[in-house]
Amino acid sequence: MPNEIFPWKIRVDESRGLAGNSGTKKSNHEALSRLQSPLNSPKLQPIGSPQASRKTSGSGSSAPLYPKWSGALSLASSRAASPAPSDSFPTFGYSQLGGLENSSKGSALFNSANSIGTPYLSSRNSNSANEASAMAFHNVSPPSGAESSSESKSFSASGKGNKADTSAEPSLDAFNSTQIKAGSTANSNSTPVEPGEDTIPTAIVVKNIPFSLEKDTLLDHFKQLGIPRPYAFNYHYDNGIFRGLAFANFYRPEEAQVVVQTLNGYEINGRRLRVEWKRQLPAAEREKVEKAKKRQAEERRRKQQYKMFEVSFTDQGLNLNDTGTLETYSRLLLFAHQCIPSREITFETTSKDGNLLNAIRIFCLYFDLDYYARPNGEVLKLVVTHPNKKNTSVSQSQPASPNLRFNMPAPLATRFLQEHSLNGTKSAPITPPPSFAVPLTNQLRSIDDKIYGNESPLQKASTLSSPFNSKNDNDASTSASKQSFGVSHF
């Protein structure tokens, strides 16, 4: 038949013989008969499928030619009988397209190491397909050379005994499903490895948790299993949605290891839990995370300080949006941090301007500074100094009213104004504190004279401490004090 009918067919120069045969090439009637039949067209079988390469003899006996799993593509042939090949046909390997020529030639070619291999046409519906599949499942080794030669003798080109018996073939799907179930059971029951260097020995990750399972319910399973409960157990939410992931922390590595071995593979609501050790981040990543945490903490601290600062000054009645108040605060801030090379800073205002006086008082208390006033007519100078460079001759604090400050002694004014400012009052009271114009020593001396008489220890101490005082002055003062209290002189 010309090659134009089959364009895919290999074109061969018919004038030359194959395999060194100088004789005229004869057509392969068996191969042509198979190709001409539309029902017996060759089909490619998948790689790895068990094929029973078996032909039956006239007596009905069968034996496997190659009962192992075929690792290459094989051509499926039909059950139709084909004419017997001639002895003069050239052979390719241990078989021809139509099968073995005879027992002796097939045996010799099967054992030949220098032969060229060709695809083997196997029958898909052979009688012994079940035997070949069973041998393939049990990893039966291929027959030896002697066995193959004896088996090849029983083969013939006739189509007797080629009835299909596909009902006896074992199910591959059932076998694969059994292997998958066994493998999954072995993996779930396998003991996990101990924590490595890149893991945290006291932290674990629980995966594949049912989405509807609550955290308290999962902790109840810890109690039922008798395993240690973590001191920290948190569900992980991705954008507010639970994805079946949780983190647990323990005090000791032994507790974590017991939980991993017990809880791994544990089934809850039809889902098997997977427990793993929590991995550490690389050193570079950990450093980045720590820096980010420090930066966030610093930002939160600054915001909190600004919030407290704003609330405190708002309660005191100060408005930092005011230009004058903001300028006063800026100057005091620079002076408090010693950014201004000066021992003191001065503010000038009128005695009737209470806003500036109130602002300086509050800012000085906030920055821990001292201030005092220098009146000059209607102009009032407020001098602010550092605590270690204060002027001891003048009061350290200044009330809102400048006239009040100069009517009181310095120590008493300082104490009164400090207590007054701590109570939260913005301005000094209208009524000044009582003035101690009369010395206390006279009152105490009169009381001592009433008790001890002339032998008063206070009188003796005052007499010794003041040698320049005359005796007459002392007697006069003593008699005056005694008369005031109604004490007679003995």
Swiss-Prot record:
One of its GO terms (cellular component) is post-mRNA release spliceosomal complex. Keywords: Cytoplasm, Phosphoprotein, Repeat, RNA-binding. Interacts with csx1. The gene is cip1. Phosphorylated by sty1. Residues 16-63, 76-97, 138-199, 457-490 are annotated as: Disordered. Residues 34-62, 164-192 have a biased composition (Polar residues). The modification Phosphoserine is found at residues 37, 41, 49, 86, 141, 397, 401, 427, 435, 456, 466. It holds the Pfam family RRM_1. The modification Phosphothreonine is found at residue 431. Residues 76-88, 141-160 have a biased composition (Low complexity). This is RNA-binding post-transcriptional regulator cip1. Its main location: cytoplasm. It is found in: Cytoplasm. GO terms for molecular function: mRNA binding. Gene3D superfamilies: 3.30.70.330.
